[in-house]
Design a protein with these regions (language model features):
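Alpha-helical elements of Rossmann-like donor-binding domains used by nucleotide-donor carbohydrate transfer enzymes
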Residues: 20, 24, 44, 58, ...
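N-terminal alpha-helical segment
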Residues: 18, 41-42, 56, 76, ...
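Structured helix-beta-strand junction loops
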Residues: 8, 43, 100-101, 127
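Short, acidic loop-to-helix structural element flanking the phosphoryl-transfer center
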Residues: 74-105, 116, 144
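Asp-based, Mg2+/Mn2+-dependent phosphohydrolase catalytic module
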Residues: 1-3, 7, 111-112, 116-200
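Metal-dependent phosphoesterase signature
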Residues: 45, 49-89
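Active-site neighborhood of HAD-like aspartate-dependent phosphohydrolases
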Residues: 1-41, 176
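Generic structural signal for small/hydrophobic residues in well-ordered secondary structure
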Residues: 8-11, 52, 98, 106, ...
Length: 200
């Protein structure tokens, strides 16, 4: 029996499109927006931020040096957070209903810049009983360490926890830890999966 439901954040609860931020950085650094993510990936700066190795201000400074722009930290955060769009991908009412009968845990590869903004602007997150965030755990999916942290936050055995994520590799990592995991495709699909398990 499922006693806890664990949700990924990006592209499961909320939609994001990094190109929205890259297009704002393009005129500041003179690098084409479609080339910026390649440079960011090669630098591993975002991974270092989301794994807790880099503090937000260090990340902003090093990214500015990498790409060649100089703006205030506040302006950088505004641009970096502009990648998220509303509405939520899963209805808040569904998440709220689940939270009344089951332990709700958020499990996300994220950073404090994004999460602080999301927490303030997306009330859906307030229904979660626990948040397991990569920059706090200092481990990113599919590292077993972060799944173990989520299992502990849920407070139940792995097989009693349902998990959904949009990335197949992360679903596989969860299954390897014993979680009942399904790749997210749509709200209706996840609702059906939860209904079939007696969660809703």
């Amino acid at each position: 029996m499922i006693k806890a439901v664990i949700f990924d954040l990006g592209r499961v609860l909320v939609h994001f499109d990094f190109s929205l931020g890259y297009r704002q950085l393009e005129p500041l650094c003179g690098i084409p927006a479609d080339e910026i993510p390649l440079r960011v990936a090669e630098s591993r700066l975002a991974i270092r931020l989301e794994s807790g190795e880099l503090a937000p201000r260090e990340f902003a400074r090093e990214l500015g040096q990498l790409l060649g722009f100089e703006i205030s930290f506040e302006e950088f955060c505004r641009i970096w957070c502009s990648v998220f769009t509303k509405p939520t991908l899963i209805p808040e009412a569904l998440v709220e209903a689940i939270g009344k009968t089951h332990r709700l845990v958020l499990l996300s590869n994220t950073n404090s810049i994004h999460f602080e903004m999301l927490w303030e602007n997306y009330p859906i997150l307030r229904h979660f009983h626990a948040c397991v965030l990569s920059h706090e755990v200092r481990a990113m999916k599919p590292n077993p360490q972060i799944y173990q942290a989520a299992i502990e936050a849920a407070g139940y055995a792995p097989e009693e926890c349902f998990f959904t994520d949009d990335i197949a590799e992360y679903v596989a990592g969860a299954k390897a830890m014993g979680l009942d995991a399904v790749q997210f495709q749509s709200a209706s699909q996840i609702e059906a999966e939860l209904r079939s398990r007696g969660v809703i």
